[in-house]
Regions:
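Conserved, well-structured core domains of diverse proteins
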Residues: 1-158, 164-174, 179-223, 229
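Gly-rich Lys/Arg/Thr-decorated short loops/hinges at beta-loop-alpha junctions or inter-strand turns
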Residues: 126-131, 238-253, 273-276
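Hydrophobic, Leu/Ile/Phe/Ala-enriched alpha-helical segments that form helix-helix packing faces
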Residues: 152, 268-275
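Non-cysteine beta-strand/loop elements that form the S-adenosyl-L-methionine
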Residues: 211-217, 235-245
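Short beta-strand/loop segments at the ligand-binding rim of alpha/beta enzyme cores
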Residues: 176-179, 272-277
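Active-site beta->alpha loop and helix N-cap motifs at the rims of alpha/beta catalytic domains
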Residues: 218-220, 243-264
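Generic structural signal for well-ordered alpha-helices
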Residues: 149, 200-201, 261-269
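Cytosolic nucleotide-binding catalytic cores of signal-transduction proteins
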Residues: 232
Length: 277
């Protein structure tokens, strides 16, 4: 009886081995009869073996075992805390932390501001950390400009005019202004588009103008510069920028007031002199 049971077990395996050897579809089964079939078995078992035997609690993407366990626990209203430290290597390069100091600095003042202006500056400015970045009148409408300036007034931070110059809407609420000068010199240009010192002085000496910003180039519009189509040049925009109504408004690719770094520094010094700062 024992031999019969042995044959009952081995004969099917032998038949499978012979079938593998004579078939011509899979070279692996032909070269390794019967044994090659374990390859596909382990391929099917691979995800389970990796998940339950090989994979650690920190392996797995996008969510590792710990993250999944946390979700499972919370979905069942169970505790998701893990006592006695952590399994993570918090000393590796991917982790950062703040260390306690035995000699801490003084507490930060309630209103933290940054002083702008060196010893040569006669009109230094105390700036907030968050401010309103450059957005021109023309790209934004008058109501938007006025609303932004009112926010600057209430929040005690500055409002950058953008390259489109200082408009009457910037002046409505007397919020602090940073006047940006680009290559088009809008608001302080002559008929040929060059820098006009008298026009600059008239605006720059206003109490509302706190700083002058020089825009060196056209950034996302290099080469040909920026263009505001004539259809968008309304009488208000033309008056603000000092350009003809209904004609294309061109911001050149480079400045005409300077062409070298030293000339830029000399021009910046001249702007300081003209603005009284």
């Amino acid at each position: 009886p024992g031999a019969l049971w042995g044959l009952a077990f081995t004969l099917p395996l032998l038949a499978i081995a012979v079938l593998d050897f004579v078939q011509k579809r899979h070279s692996l089964r032909r070269n390794y009869p019967l044994v090659a079939r374990f390859r596909w078995l382990f391929e099917d078992l691979r995800p389970y073996l990796r998940s339950y035997i090989v994979e650690s609690n920190q392996d797995g993407r996008p969510f590792d075992k710990n993250a999944r366990a946390l979700v499972y626990a919370r979905s069942k209203n169970q505790t998701s805390t893990h006592p006695f430290g952590t399994e993570l290597d918090v000393y590796s390069d991917e982790y950062e932390w703040l260390s306690h100091s035995v000699a801490p600095n003084e507490s930060v003042p309630a209103e933290f501001r940054l002083a702008i202006g060196g010893p040569q500056c006669t009109r230094p400015y105390s700036a907030a950390i968050p401010n309103i970045s450059a957005m021109s009148f023309g790209s934004l409408g008058g109501k938007a400009i006025a609303a932004l300036n009112l926010g600057a007034k209430r929040g005690k931070f500055y409002h950058d005019t953008g390259e489109g110059s200082f408009s009457k809407y910037h002046a409505l609420y007397d919020g602090d202004i940073v006047w940006e000068l680009g290559s088009g010199y809008f608001g302080c240009r002559d008929a040929q588009g060059h820098f006009d010192e008298d026009a600059f002085r008239k605006t720059a000496t206003l109490d509302q103008i706190k700083m002058i910003e020089i825009k060196l180039s056209q950034g996302a519009k290099p080469g040909h510069g920026g263009v505001l189509p004539g259809a968008k040049v309304t009488p208000e925009i033309a008056e603000t920028r000092g350009i003809p109504v209904g004609e294309d408004c061109v911001s050149p690719a480079a400045h005409s007031a300077f062409s070298t770094p030293l000339e830029l520094l000399a021009w910046a010094a001249r702007l300081r002199e003209l603005s009284g700062g």
